[in-house]
């Protein structure tokens, strides 16, 4: 059985291109693997705590190897609980719209809450940083309204801080096996939008069949 975690990052729901492509992937994957267990984290309905002084005190106490007070223990336990679905998953699917050339603030908030030493990575002077989510696969469905090709006014090397950031974060926490699904030009008219979504959905279905053939 594959445990699939879908992190949903768009509030647009039925109108979301990233969510549409992620659903195409998940549906096709489940057709190949009917026993797949799917868990969804909708970041817009999830109660994300603030990374406040107590949580930061807990973080630095952990780094220093110092005991945590009661309030710090509660704050740290909440961060661990938020990260637990990532540890449990075999396959991580993220549906990510591009906002102002980067990722939605809800996703950045989530990443900041769970990306800590002892939760998603380890650190020691001899081995440096080691991601704790090894032997997992990630599929990211990226949606962009504009054209990010090299000939456009927003070429990806200069304007795309969405995909490179997610790839770096996934590598940092130990997920080297990554796949990208990209749908662009979604605000350039209904015909272009529909064609872009259709092409990305076909790529998603093909990738799902490819990954479903593997054993987890």
UniProtKB/Swiss-Prot annotation:
Cofactor note as given: Binds 1 FMN per subunit.
Cofactors, names only: FMN
Binding positions (FMN): 10, 16-18
Pfam short name (any one): Flavodoxin_2
Keywords: Flavoprotein, FMN, NAD, Oxidoreductase
Function: Quinone reductase that provides resistance to thiol-specific stress caused by electrophilic quinones.
Record's protein name: FMN-dependent NADH:quinone oxidoreductase 3
Organism of this sequence: Pseudomonas fluorescens (strain ATCC BAA-477 / NRRL B-23932 / Pf-5)
Taxonomic path: Bacteria, Pseudomonadati, Pseudomonadota, Gammaproteobacteria, Pseudomonadales
């Amino acid at each position: 059985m594959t445990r699939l975690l879908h992190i949903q990052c768009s509030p647009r729901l039925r109108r979301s291109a990233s969510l549409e492509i992620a659903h195409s992937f998940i549906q096709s994957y489940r057709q190949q693997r009917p026993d797949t267990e799917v868990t969804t984290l909708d970041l817009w309905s999830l109660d994300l705590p603030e990374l406040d002084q107590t949580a930061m005190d807990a973080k630095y106490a952990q780094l220093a190897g110092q005991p945590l007070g009661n309030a710090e223990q509660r704050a740290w336990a909440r961060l661990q609980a938020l990260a637990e679905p990532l540890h449990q998953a075999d396959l991580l699917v993220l549906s990510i719209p591009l906002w102002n050339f980067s990722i939605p603030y809800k996703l950045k908030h989530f990443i900041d809450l769970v990306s800590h030493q002892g939760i998603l990575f380890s650190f020691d002077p001899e081995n440096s940083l080691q991601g704790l989510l090894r032997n997992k696969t990630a599929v990211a469905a990226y949606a962009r309204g504009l054209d990010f090709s090299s000939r456009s006014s927003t070429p990806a090397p200069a304007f795309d801080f969405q995909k490179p950031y997610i790839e770096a974060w996934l590598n940092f926490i130990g997920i080297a096996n990554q796949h990208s699904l990209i749908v662009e030009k979604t605000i350039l008219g209904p015909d272009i939008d529909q064609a872009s979504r259709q092409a990305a959905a076909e790529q998603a279905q093909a990738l799902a069949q490819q990954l479903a053939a593997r054993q987890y």
